[in-house]
Amino acid sequence: MRYDFSTIEKKWQSFWLKNNSFSSGESTDKPKYYVLDMFPYPSGSGLHVGHLEGYTATDIVARYKRSCGYNVLHPMGWDAFGLPAEQFAIKTGTHPKNTTEKNISSFRETLQAMGFSYDWSREINTTSPDYFRWTQWIFIKLYELGLAYVSEVDINWCEELKTVLANEEVEEKVKEGYTVIRKPLRQWVLKITAYAERLLDDLDELDWPENVKQMQRNWIGRSEGMEIDFELRCHNRKLRVYTTRPDTLFGATFLVISPEHPLALKLATAQQLVAVTQYIKEAKLKSELERTGLQKDKTGIFTGSFAINPATGDPLPVWISDFVLTSYGTGAIMSVPAHDSRDWEFAKKFGLPIIEVIKSPDGVDDAAFEGKESVSINSSNPEISIDGLHFSEAFQIMAHWLETKGLGERKVTYKLRDWIFSRQRYWGEPIPVKHYEDGSIRTESNLPLQLPEVEAYQPSETGESPLATMHDWLYGADEFGSFRRETNTMPQWAGSCWYYLRFIDPENNAQLIDPAKEKYWMNVDLYIGGAEHAVLHLLYARFWHKVLYDLGVVSSREPFKKLFNQGMILGEDNEKMSKSRGNVIPADQVLKDYGADAVRLYEMFLGPLEQVKPWNTNGIEGISRFLGKVWRLVYPDSENPDQRDQAAVLDENPLPEILQRRMHKTIKKVTEDTDHLKFNTAISEMMVFVNELQKNGCRQKSAVENLLLMLAPYAPHITAELWQAIGHTSPISAEPFPVFDPAIAEDPVVTIAVQVNGKLRGRFTAPAKSPEESLVDMAKHVDTVIKFLEGQTIVKEIVIQDKLVNFAVKQSIPNH
């Protein structure tokens, strides 16, 4: 029989769907394993080969864990609200719902063509009313807890998209060429800052990549410092600043406040008022990214006012600059240019004093010295001296002095800011609240609150969403009076904050999730997706999960036990795939040309899963040849028209000892590598085994069966077909993974390297697991080693079991 991958793959995909082969049961007598992909946004451009990498990895794990006796939950769904569908609707007039459904159908078809073993009975769609009613329910709970509130805030406004962007979204949109400005707007805000400490502390218990955890730590930005009061000269009031370095107070030579600070205009003298007003106006048009970029040229304006340094009594000019943000600390800083690079640049530009108060190895004329390892200098007055003290001690003494004098207090602050949750768009979850004429707000009692049909999808020039034009939907009355519904919708992140829970109980109309099912399936054991979501989806989902934990809806503090970030697959030109570069490789095309098993194996064989690697079509052709070798183990005459439909009669006799050992070594290696997501080396080991079988003309049934069982999670279609061809009636997907015998898997004889002072001097063979003293003795008698030990004193003997003996020697001193 010829290896016709197209026919074979369709056959088994149809079989799996028809028989619900990968349905997750609720049997609690099995250990559970929940493996999850970051579910996709169904875009109109479809899936390319880079998208398939993470999905292939999770599918290998899901199939492998099932074969190891686990009850596996491996679901798929669609994160389908979002800007692209709405922008397409604006251009074409097509309802986003229709576009989304079409795109989902295309995505589903591709994923099924890859043979992914999803439990399709659990499929979810964030735009389905049955789903977003519970997203709205969570919002109501947030509101009832005081974690959702309305505020007039300066927001990041995108002119082209006519919508608000969260702080976390700005950088991406600016890179895409959009204009982002700051302007005040009434917004719904979620109080994520109330969970800042827990979000930070609980990172330590997660099995996540350290770089992702560090990105979240940096984004949350916990800092311990002090708020210090500076007397304002001629104003009879104080200006409070936040600093993490009270030990540098003696070096403060000016203060800087944000353009939005409530004292900004009040501190402007008559001579400076016009210039200050103009500066504030211009600063408010800039995005935070523009204002805080380290490379940007520093700008500022002197208010004309002065404050008094509480440590020195010196007058300090008060400036306004856009690099200071109201949202961090107090919106005012003390500037110590000798020991802060931004302050140094500012001082140099505007000719302000620079006073060294931490001993710097190279001085501070050419750059600020920001280290904490040196000691304080020039830091004393008649009441206190911290000269000669290192940072930690100087901090404590200075803080105590300021607190005793009533000049300041210790504070813990966070860079993290509350999450702006409103979007002035149509295609998002309606926010389920009503605004009454008396100013009160009430939540919707009948969920889901659905989107009305609209005639136009464009956001209004006033900043309101298209919902503001739908009067029949917008206005109403009930027992509490006349009301106006909220016209903002939720951001695209809302539905993905809790989707992993809905997969557990997707048909439940009575509650968000059944407690018994939640307790059985949570946490997610393995979550695979891109590192680009470190401070967006992953942080938001952790926040919502902690709220649900406090409400008693979930039983764990964290949603995702282990996170793994797959590396990107680049185009053949070694660049990131994109339409603009013209280097996108559509998934459907390679599936048609090479088949799902070849694509799956090739993407996993490219290199370590976490690494970035380029696509190479020549490589996938090599994988196709490997699959042909596997096929010919069962159909050796597949190229012979007269005999190609005849499967080989496999030999029931035991394997020769050398192949038996090779088989068990292969099972051991593939098991260990699959457990550790080292798929490329597992595939390599199976290739070596196939070559050994071919070279030895092996037709033993046990060898072929064990090969197919090992390969099944990686290449499920060809293995299912060959398993059936050699006489099995039950599908291979229901079979257990092969188990190796440790005694057989170990080599009976091993080669040991001998080093003298780290240099290779010889080798010898020895029985595996030989005692250390035996290995040392044998190593001393290796012919090529003896001469390097003569006249030497052995200082140390280092033995690595079954691998190495190293002698550390020094020349013997003769006795006279």
Swiss-Prot record:
GO terms for biological process: leucyl-tRNA aminoacylation. One of its GO terms (cellular component) is cytosol. Its EC number is 6.1.1.4. It catalyses: tRNA(Leu) + L-leucine + ATP = L-leucyl-tRNA(Leu) + AMP + diphosphate. It is found in: Cytoplasm. InterPro entries: aa-tRNA-synth_Ia, Leu-tRNA-ligase, Leu_tRNA-synth_edit, M/V/L/I-tRNA-synth_anticd-bd, Methionyl/Leucyl_tRNA_Synth, Rossmann-like_a/b/a_fold, tRNAsynth_Ia_anticodon-bd, Val/Leu/Ile-tRNA-synth_edit. Pfam families: Anticodon_1 (PF08264), tRNA-synt_1 (PF00133), tRNA-synt_1_2 (PF13603), tRNA-synt_1g (PF09334). NCBIfam families: leuS_bact (TIGR00396). HAMAP family: Leu_tRNA_synth_B (MF_00049_B). This is Leucine--tRNA ligase. ATP binds at residue 579. Belongs to the class-I aminoacyl-tRNA synthetase family. The keyword Amino-acid biosynthesis does not apply. One of its GO terms (molecular function) is ATP binding. A motif ('HIGH' region) lies at residues 40-51. Disulfide bonds: none annotated. A motif ('KMSKS' region) lies at residues 576-580.
